[in-house]
Swiss-Prot record:
Any single Gene Ontology cellular-component annotation: cytosol
Name of the protein described by the UniProt record: Translation initiation factor IF-1, chloroplastic
Source organism (scientific name): Antirrhinum majus
Quaternary context: Component of the 30S ribosomal translation pre-initiation complex which assembles on the 30S ribosome in the order IF-2 and IF-3, IF-1 and N-formylmethionyl-tRNA(fMet); mRNA recruitment can occur at any time during PIC assembly.
Top-rank taxon: Eukaryota
Physiological role: One of the essential components for the initiation of protein synthesis. Stabilizes the binding of IF-2 and IF-3 on the 30S subunit to which N-formylmethionyl-tRNA(fMet) subsequently binds. Helps modulate mRNA selection, yielding the 30S pre-initiation complex (PIC). Upon addition of the 50S ribosomal subunit IF-1, IF-2 and IF-3 are released leaving the mature 70S translation initiation complex.
PROSITE patterns reported for this sequence: S1_IF1_TYPE
GO terms of molecular function: ribosome binding; rRNA binding; translation initiation factor activity
Length: 77
């Protein structure tokens, strides 16, 4: 049976070494996020201030996997 995961949206507040980030979720929780393999392979750059979708396990709600970087409304890309 596959493990159930919660998907949240959050804001990157701090960049840490080795593809890790401090993420503030929309419900004001601070968690540690790491970059998923697809984002790492696609060379998608994640910077502080970016909005992301993060997948959090039910068993460890202090860590999550960043699965998508949302587009900023003011950027041209």
């Amino acid at each position: 049976m596959k493990e159930q995961k919660w998907i949240h949206e959050g804001l990157i507040t701090e960049s840490l070494p080795n593809g890790m980030f401090r993420v503030r979720l929309d419900n004001e929780d601070l968690i540690l996020g790491y970059v998923s393999g697809k984002i790492r392979r696609s060379f998608i750059r994640i910077l502080p201030g970016d909005k992301v979708k993060i997948e959090v396990s039910r068993y460890d709600s202090t860590r999550g996997r960043i699965i998508y970087r949302l587009r900023n409304k003011d950027s041209k890309d």
